[in-house]
Each structure stands twice: as C-alpha cells, then as structure tokens.
Amino acid sequence: MPIDCRGRILSDDYYDAITDFPVELLEDYTDEQCYADVDGLYNVIYFGREELRNPQAYFISYRSVPKLYGLMQEGGGTGGFDPNSLIASGITQVQREPLALTGRGVIICIVDTGIDYTDPVFRNEDGTSRILAIWDQTVQTGTPPAGFQYGTEFTREDINRALQSEDPYSVVPSRDEIGHGSALASVAAGSRLNGGYTFQGAAPGADIVVVKLKECKPYLRSFYLVPQGVPAYQENDIMLGVQYADGFAEPFRRPVVICLGMGTNYGDHTGNSPLGRYLSAVAVKRSRAVVVAGGNEGNAAHHFQGQLNNQGGTGANSRAVEVRVEQGVEGFVMELWGSLPDIFTIAVRTPGGETIPPVRLGIRGQITYSFIYEKSRVTVTGNLVEPVSGEELVVMRVQDPTPGIWTFQIEAVGEIHNGEFNMWLPVSQFLSAPVYFLESSPYITLTEPSMASSVIGVSTYDAANNSFYINSGRGFSRCGAIRPDFAAPGVDVPTVNGKGSDSSLAAAITAGAVAQFMQWAVVEQNNSVVESREIKNYFIRGASRSFDVTYPNREWGYGRLNMVGTFDALIGV
C-alpha cells in the first residue's frame, strides 16, 4: 500500500531535501514526488531511499540535505523574578505611561520545543489563554494547519476548552517536555502576575503563536553524528514553522515577531543557508520582524581561522590544524570554507600516526578512508564551488575518532591569491565529549542563521554588571558584515522555569522589545509599514554605548539594547 505524504514526512525510510529548483526537475532523481512549498522560494521534497537513483549524490549535495539545529541553552537555573534585565534594556520604562508599550496588537511567534499552555504566565487575567494557536508537528491525531501536511493545529478555542477541563492534555495533547520554548515565550511575552512582582515578560500584552518542532529523523542524526537524546531539529521543519507563523497573521493584518532560539555551526557563516535566506525574505516583509540568537560558541574553541601565503615561514602555503578529541567522542562533522579564488587540499594524521595523503576531489566528490591500527573512519566530501557562496567547501565526517591530537594539514594548490580559510566544529551540544581546536579563534562564532542579512541577530551580556557573556558568540560574519547588531541581556534572566543564562534568552528579550516597537509603529500607526531592517536600525541608533569602546565591534555590535534610547533617538534627544 503506498504511503501518504504525511507518512513520508514522518518516516525515517524517506529522505528530506531542500531545493530551489522546480519540482519537475526531480524526475532526474526520483520517480515519486511528495513536497511542500516554502513561500515560493524553496521546495521540501520527501522521497524513499529505494526511489533515489544515486544515494551518494544526495549526501554530496550540501544545501539539499537539511542541517540540524540545536537549542541555544546552557542549562536551567533557580531563583525568583527580578526585573533587572528588562530595566537594563529600557523595556520596563516604555511599558509605563505615556508610551504604555506592552506589545498590544502584536503576535510573537516562538518556533521551538512547544509551550506549557497551562501555566498562568500565558493566560489573561480572566484565565483564558493568550495563545492564539499551537502547531504541534509531533502530534498526528488531529488536523494539520491549512497548507501543511503533518502535525496538528490547536486553536485558542481548543486551548481554552482544555484549560476548563479536569484533564487539559486529553483535549490539547501538546506538551513542552524540554521547557525551552516555554522559557523563551515567558521572557518575550509572559503575563504580568501580581502586578509584575511575581513575573512579567517584555511584552505582556502581545498574543502568542507557537510552533512545536518535531525532532530530526534518525538518518540525519546518524549522518551528522549527533548523540542520541540531544534535541536536534531539521532545517526544513524550522522553515515550515516560520512559514506558518508568517502566514497565520495575514488574515488579521497583524504585525508578527518571530523568535528563533536555535543555531548551528554548519554553513558558510554569512547567512546564506536556505533557512537564513528564507528568514531574510520574511524579515523584509512589512509588519514582520525576525530575531535570532547568536549562540553560545564564543568560548568553545570550535572555530579556526587560517591564512596561507607565498612568502614562506609562518602562514606559508601549508598550515597544520590540530584538533583535540577527548575520550568518549562518537564522531563529529567538521567543515572547511576556503576563500576565493584559491584551491585547498587536506591531509590527515591520526593520533596513532596513520595518515591520509592530500585529498583533492575536483568539482564534486566523496571518498572514505579507514585505517589499519585504528577503527576510525574519515569521509571527505568536496565541493570546489559551493553553489551560493561560490567558495570551496570541504566536509570531513570523522567516525569513532581515536582520542588524542588529530592533525589536518591544509595546503593551497599553486599560487596563493587570498589564502584565507575557516574551519568549524559542531555546536557543543552536538558532541558526546569535548572536541576543540588547539589554536582557535573566538571570532566568527555567531551561530547560523543569526548572520542572515535582514534578521536581527543579537549577542549576550550580563545586565548586572554590563559585562560581555563569556560564552556568547562573536562576530563579524565570515565576509566581514557587521554582526551582531547589538547585545541584549541573557545572564540570570528570569523565566517560567527559573533563571537562565544563554543567548536564546537574549533573543527572547529582544523579540519582546521588537513587539513593543511594533505596537507603537504599526498598531498605533506611527509607521505602519515598518519591517525588520528598519527596526534593527532604530534599535542601533538607540543602543547604549560605553565611551571607552569603539563601535561597531565583534562582541557588542553597535551597543546594548535600550528601548528608552530608541525612542529618545526618534525625537532627537
């Protein structure tokens, strides 16, 4: 019996692919088609493994294989509510008269792990829900949203019926088992409880829409060597979640702020991934804004920046890159991006002294190496011209790595014109034990897609003492674009689950601030056609800056989020 489209989307027997070409061209690759359109920009294709005529071509096609994104969290905390982060951002001040900006009339959408819809922090004073809808991609017992083929959509009416029931989850069986999505939603839009003394979010008057993402398919977890039990989400599911959020408000002509607290180290670190490009396309729409966390990779030693030249000595036409692999690492995927117009080769030396000669795969190719005395396997995939960036990309997939120092010898072919190359290891949570560069760079460590051109990408600081958060990602982008845009509080931030410290909370605070601005601009018709790029630049003009720091810089971007400063800048103060 043929499996339906929903079955293909959910089954590990079917591969997912992200394409930007007409679906008719897929006849060259597979006989049957099941696909989802992403706003006319991309198609997500689902096809059986046995239907694929050339399986290796699928995995070599870098952009077609969905990347995996992890939660930008670093563990929960304890402690009650305090408004320090909101005050430092000027958010509490503009909640008060005369501006009275609470996000009223604005929709904040959290694309994440779901939400605890029963918590009072997501209810109105009369006990009804402030959540307009939940698209739970993991629940298949109900009806999907219009235009989508999997999951179940729960409306505000459904949620209110559940809240009146003795067993709410028998009516709306959507839970946030991890708590990350609930934390973000509470920081961005949590209700004012007990007059704001017990809890309040940045935009307590905003409505909420939630997308609960399904976890990645096992074949992708295996391909990227992500440990079992670690939350990991597919790029295409996130894209469809963003599309749902964008489209939900269209019938109501409501402004929307989309908050993404996830990230990855896969990609060219210029915002050119399919997700990054799609987020930028949404962000330039009127009455839309997209806020993305900058990640927690700044202190992880997961980035190496190298420079080759023709002069000999340090930085000559060859460079040894050493990677320390601790005991217990199941595997890792590492990427090298080589700058135009140079061509690079890679040789490998294991901790046991076995070697792989310099690898050069031509236009596109893949080769796997095994060793005599070590059980490790190394698969090298090369793209001489990565289609969007135009630069050389080499992906190294290392399975069962021997603990110790791995040496990757990077060499340029022929005369060197630029000589720069960058390498990234996976985000920390995608490693079963530490793996890191012995000579790392803390810069260009913002996670994708925070470097997408039109989104608001933020780094993280501690509002208690105005210090930069040591784990926060740092800019700029690989091509030198100014990222982050600014920093927002993300240390000891009160959430519905206790205090937390990570970049996703900085993004949530910023999303709430954006909702405040959209209330003033769109709902109150002071600038009804504003979009993400304009809001970003208003916020940049109002950001707090220290007199002894040069801006923009790699840590702070243009300064610290300051809503009072933003409105002062509007009136010329």
Positions of PLM-derived features:
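Autoinhibitory propeptides
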Residues: 1-107, 113-130, 404, 444-448
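Edge beta-strands of jelly-roll/beta-sandwich modules across compartments, strongly enriched
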Residues: 415-428
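Hydrolase catalytic cores
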Residues: 185-188, 196, 209-217, 246-256, ...
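Catalytic cores of secreted or luminal carbohydrate-active enzymes
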Residues: 257-258, 275-312, 559, 563-568
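Subtilisin-like serine protease catalytic core
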Residues: 95-234, 329-330, 341-342, 451-454, ...
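Extracellular S/T/G-rich loop segment that most often corresponds to the catalytic His/Ser-adjacent loop
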Residues: 135-137, 148-158, 300-392, 410-411, ...
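Noncatalytic modules at the cell exterior or secretory-pathway interfaces
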Residues: 329-332, 397-415
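Short acidic, glycine-rich surface-loop motifs adjacent to enzyme active sites
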Residues: 66-68, 240-270, 293-294, 411-413
